[in-house]
Amino acid sequence: MAAGTLYTYPENWRAFKAQIAAQYSGARLKIASASPAFTFGQTNRSPAFLSNFPLGKVPAYQGDDGFCLFESNAIAHFLSNDALRGSTPQASAQVLQWVSFADSEIIPPASAWVFPTLGIMQFNKQATEQAKEEVKRVLAVLNQHLNTRTFLVGERVSLADITVVCSLLWLYKQVLEPAFRQPYPNVTRWFLTCVNQPQFKAVLGEVKLCEKMAQFDAKKFAEMQPKKEAPAKKEKAGKEGGKQQQPQQEKKEKKKEEKKAAPAEEEMDECEAALASEPKAKDPYAHLPKSSFVMDEFKRKYSNEDTLTVALPYFWDHFDREGFSIWYAEYRFPEELTMSFMSCNLITGMFQRLDKLRKNAFASVILFGANNDSCISGIWVFRGQELAFTLSEDWQIDYESYTWRKLDVDSEECKTMVKEYFAWEGEFKHVGKSFNQGKIFK
């Protein structure tokens, strides 16, 4: 498993790709984005840094073994696992296709449109209007592709999704207001599905979509430009005047720099404070003795290893029958299910709203059948012996749309169901329909 340091500046969307990939693969990644570990504009110009990364660009990766990489896509690829890169030659090629698509089709128009709104590029009306049209074309391509798909390649998040999401991030945050994104519902549905995955959230935090399209701010642009030296004619004020004016100007510049930095620091503090305050809510499982079954370790095995030969044996070898329970759930209203992608949205929507339950649960939920003839059922593993949803108001979401049956962990029925639902393969005799696609809550 890879282990190393990623050098970057804060909020670098190119670095986000590598960070999210590491969240999925389990790669041990240290982030150097602040002094003394890394100061952008200084550290990356030092001889020591340039000897490993000749261009002086970030993100840049240095492994604990001394292995060095620059270019964000290469770093993200290196930190991924086989599931993210594409487990077959075809899937791997498709992942590369979408990574290239992001670089060549999304980034140029996104930069031309978004950068002026951030004050880091001069506004050009013709260039901006052209960029908007190119973004529409890109979104139309994605919308068509995602019409019958949950993710860009295969049935799980891949490096394709990570890369394209990060490339669209500032568009969604700055300029894609509701009216503009309305014709592309599949793209927005997919984008929200991705950014609400715990691995994305760990890096991006809570992503808020743009409510009103940001516009070019001439004042902000002027503030972002390098300060010019005071004209020589001001020396007429005398030596003392010059001496007084210079420190004042420096103070003003320092204050402006502090003001620019302050919002990011305050926002981070608020975010961290909010996250820190969440666990203080009453834990429904606080009364239970510590379990020998480490849910997070099983989830890592499931994500990174073969299900049948590694993850499943690990599950049964370590499963705590007293501290955990296994439940079978079946959607109550199969007659209301229509298009497959809409049925999948029911599942992912429930998962997203149950985010606070993740550390105490695991589930594999499957859509069976085809359009207008389908059903949904799944296997859930909960902490404790009771159905989790009734234990906390935060968890009472969508569960009443399902019937729930606690399984006997020693029964052959339970062992067969766990195997089939976790592996997404088998006869599924109790269903009577073929496997369509599955979703994992972890």
Swiss-Prot record:
Please give the InterPro entries that the UniProt record associates with this protein.
Answer: EF-GSTs, EF1B_G_C, EF1B_G_C_sf, Glutathione-S-Trfase_C-like, Glutathione-S-Trfase_C_sf, Glutathione_S-Trfase, Glutathione_S-Trfase_N, GST_C
Q: Where does the source fall among the domains of life? A: Eukaryota
Basic and acidic residues compositional bias: what residue ranges?
Answer: 224-242, 249-263
Keyword vocabulary terms for this entry:
Elongation factor, Protein biosynthesis
- Domain EF-1-gamma C-terminal residue range list: 281-442
> Key word Membrane present in the record?
no
Q: What SMART domains does its record include?
A: EF1G
Question: Which CDD domains does the annotation name?
Answer: GST_C_EF1Bgamma_like (cd03181), GST_N_EF1Bgamma (cd03044)
- Domain GST N-terminal span(s) in chain numbering: 2-87
One Pfam family assigned to this protein is EF1G
Q: Which residues form the GST C-terminal domain?
A: 88-216
For this chain, one GO molecular function annotation is: translation elongation factor activity
Where is region (Disordered) located? 224-273
Gene Ontology cellular-component terms listed? cytoplasm; nucleus
Q: Where are the transmembrane segments?
A: none
Q: Which PANTHER family match?
A: ELONGATION FACTOR 1-GAMMA
Main role?
Probably plays a role in anchoring the complex to other cellular components.
How would you summarize the oligomeric state and partners of this protein? EF-1 is composed of four subunits: alpha, beta, delta, and gamma.
Q: What is this protein called?
A: Elongation factor 1-gamma
Q: Which species does the entry assign this protein to?
A: Carassius auratus (Goldfish)
